[in-house]
């Protein structure tokens, strides 16, 4: 290369280096802007999440906030309130990257005080540059994003709206975020709270909960796993396999095709225990009870006896077998001897207590039937058994006794004996006679 060309080469190299340096500086600026934009987008998402939580809080507590706010005095919602009620996670920070703190100011709508409107405003910390405010206002997805540039007015993205902070009772400064929640937005939040969701929403159990009565319009609830309720009213039938009740079961009537088993008493306050056919009441443990198998008699199951320490009373009492009494038989009515009676065989008493019986149609004293029996005994008879008699006695001695030993006696069973024999030097008597009296049960 000739010497006179060296200057141009140096000049070309310097120009190239300058262009490269300019490109690097320009790229660094673009990269810096990119990083800032990403940071502001992240801030916008955080503001959107906070605003969404505030919107849900207002929707759930709409009535309460109506009572605590006016058209000029706001109800203020803080980050702590949203975390304590579960609308924000416990790890959500109280301030953003610039140290600004978000709060929501809820007031009544001036034209329709029954409706609520709100504004989310950041305060404190370091102000954002205007470029950041404009970017974040466009990226906020919940409500209408905006910013505060003059310390008094909230301006929407693309300057689409402008509202004085004083309308919401809010205070802030330049370089801060503002989000407008309109009456329509908050009315929708209230409706979201009242809407019953078909599926579970994580962190929102209230969306699967009814807060008022529901009318099914005579339609069915099918494939229900369990129904938990305090009371139930049914105008038709209730069908099921089993039922368990810890309290009372009440109704006008009940029909059971098989059995009813109770662990305690079955009580009727003003009705009957009614059975049909040849059934009645049965004690399963002991096999006794009462039933009717015809139209006349109440019968004992398995012919069980009836035991009571009180009275058994009736028009007539009949025993097909023997009639026993553990004490006495008391006849309360009296009869008069000689008076007419019917039927024969009745037993009564007179006013002195003497027994009377109905004989041939007339009351009379019992007639004692008796017979006599005479035994003629020879000499030298010892302990001759005469048999069972009511009473026996000497009735004849054949001639004067010659002496000896004569005796008529009985044992404890009314068996009578007689002896007639010599005694010492005295000869026994002659032929003797003993006459015995026979009564019913004693000889007769």
UniProtKB/Swiss-Prot annotation:
UniProt keywords, alphabetically: Plasmid
Annotated Pfam families: Shufflon_N
Recorded superkingdom: Bacteria
Region (Variable region): 362-444
Stretch forming the signal peptide: none
InterPro entries: Enolase-like_N, Shufflon_N
Region annotation (Constant region) ranges: 1-361
SUPFAM superfamilies linked to this entry: Enolase N-terminal domain-like
Note, other: This protein is expressed by a shufflon (= clustered inversion region that works as a biological switch). The orfs of this region share a constant N-terminus, while the C-terminus is variable.
Protein name listed in UniProt: Shufflon protein C
């Amino acid at each position: 290369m000739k010497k006179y060309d060296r200057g141009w080469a140096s000049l070309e190299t310097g120009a190239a280096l300058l262009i490269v340096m300019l490109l690097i500086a320009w790229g660094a600026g673009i990269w810096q802007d990119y990083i800032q934009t990403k940071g502001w987008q992240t801030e916008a998402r955080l503001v959107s999440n906070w605003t969404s939580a505030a919107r849900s809080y207002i929707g759930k507590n709409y009535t309460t906030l109506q009572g605590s706010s006016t058209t000029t005095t706001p109800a203020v919602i803080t980050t702590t309130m949203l975390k304590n009620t579960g609308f924000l996670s416990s790890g959500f920070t109280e301030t953003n990257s610039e140290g600004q703190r978000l709060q929501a100011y809820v007031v009544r709508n001036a034209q329709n005080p029954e409706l609520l409107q709100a504004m989310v405003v950041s305060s404190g910390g370091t102000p954002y540059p205007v470029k950041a405010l404009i970017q974040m206002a466009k990226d906020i997805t919940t409500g209408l994003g905006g910013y505060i540039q003059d310390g008094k007015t909230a301006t929407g993205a693309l300057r689409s709206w402008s509202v004085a902070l004083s309308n919401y009772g809010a205070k802030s400064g330049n370089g801060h975020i503002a989000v407008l929640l309109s009456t329509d937005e908050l009315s929708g939040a209230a409706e979201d709270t009242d809407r019953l969701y078909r599926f579970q929403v994580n962190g929102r159990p209230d969306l699967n909960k009814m807060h008022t009565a529901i009318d099914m319009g005579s339609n069915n609830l099918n494939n229900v796993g369990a129904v938990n309720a305090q009371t139930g009213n049914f105008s038709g039938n209730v069908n099921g396999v089993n039922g368990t009740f810890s309290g009372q079961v009440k109704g006008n009537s009940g029909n059971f095709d098989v059995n009813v088993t109770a662990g305690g008493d079955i009580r009727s306050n003003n009705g009957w225990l009614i059975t049909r056919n040849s059934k009645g009441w049965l004690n399963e443990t002991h096999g006794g009870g009462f039933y009717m198998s015809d139209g006349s008699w109440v019968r004992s199951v398995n012919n069980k006896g009836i035991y009571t320490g009180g009275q058994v009373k009736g028009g007539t009492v009949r025993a097909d077998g023997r009639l026993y009494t553990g004490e006495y038989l008391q006849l309360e009515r009296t009869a008069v001897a000689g008076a007419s009676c019917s039927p024969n065989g009745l037993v009564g008493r007179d006013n002195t207590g003497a027994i009377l019986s109905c004989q041939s149609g007339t009351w009379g004293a019992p007639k004692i039937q008796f017979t006599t029996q005479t035994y003629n005994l020879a000499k030298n008879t010892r302990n001759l058994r005469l048999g069972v008699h009511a009473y026996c006695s000497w009735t004849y001695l054949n001639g004067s006794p010659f002496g000896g030993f004569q005796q008529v006696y009985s044992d404890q069973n009314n068996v009578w004996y007689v002896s007639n024999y010599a005694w010492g030097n005295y000869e026994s008597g002659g032929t003797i006679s003993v006459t015995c009296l026979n009564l019913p049960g004693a000889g007769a």
